[in-house]
Amino acid sequence: KESQYLQEMFDKNVEGLIIEPTKSSLVPKNLSYFKAFENRRVPYVFIHGWYEKMEDKPMVIVDDEKGMFEAVDYLAKKGKRKIAGIFKVDDIQGINRHKGYVKALMNNGIAYDPDLVVWFHSEDKYLKCSYGVQKLFGSSQKPDSVACYNDEIAVWVIKELNDMNLAVPQDVSVTGFDDSFLASSAVANLTTIKHPKDLLGEHAARMVLELINEQDPVENGSAKDISTKV
């Protein structure tokens, strides 16, 4: 669908674009569209992520690695030692959040165990997460906590745990990421990482307007990194 929307924007002769990449950890399929916008001197700004080989383009992003580090460090400081992780494999946010997970484990003297990590794709998130939770908690060495890619996954994990007669947070601690409305609507009070969505949008809009007013907009790549907090 990204190619369809990019074509629509191209046909409408827009003056600038804010783009949230899809499957950003994979090689981009629509480089020809981005090149076409550049040839037309139309600036674009990536938000939330970027594509491989396009790291030099203007972008506004959250420090996903730092955010997940904070979540896992929080669990470790609460005495959790068997911390599972669930991450999305086909976007750059998932890859960087996994890096933060690994770094926090190491920082707290906890060995990384790949058997405690569940990976999912956009298309199979519920299937993979359900299977992963059942496998993790069906073993004799159950995790004492789960750090999730985002709040949506965390709420799904809580549902699966409840179906297995495991209470959150009494039996298992679960953390999310995004501080979305789902965090407050979860059965358990979900600890989550605040995602500054409004700030991201403001910075992206300001950046694209500044680029529109420049003489050479596509020659001026820059990045704005927004911090997170528990």
Regions from the PLM with identified roles:
Residues 58-85, 99, 103, 126-135, ...:
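Hydrophobic alpha-helical segments within soluble ligand-binding/sensing domains
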Residues 64, 94, 150-151:
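Helix N-cap/beta->alpha junction signal
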Residues 1-73, 138:
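Alpha-helical recognition/docking segments in bacterial nutrient-uptake
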Residues 130-230:
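Flexible loop/turn connectors
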Residues 82, 112-116, 168-173:
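Short acidic capping loops at alpha-helix termini that bridge into adjacent secondary structure
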Residues 14-24, 45, 84-87, 118, ...:
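Periplasmic-binding protein-like
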Residues 1, 21, 116-126:
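Short beta->alpha junction loops
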Residues 69-110, 220-230:
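An alpha-beta-alpha
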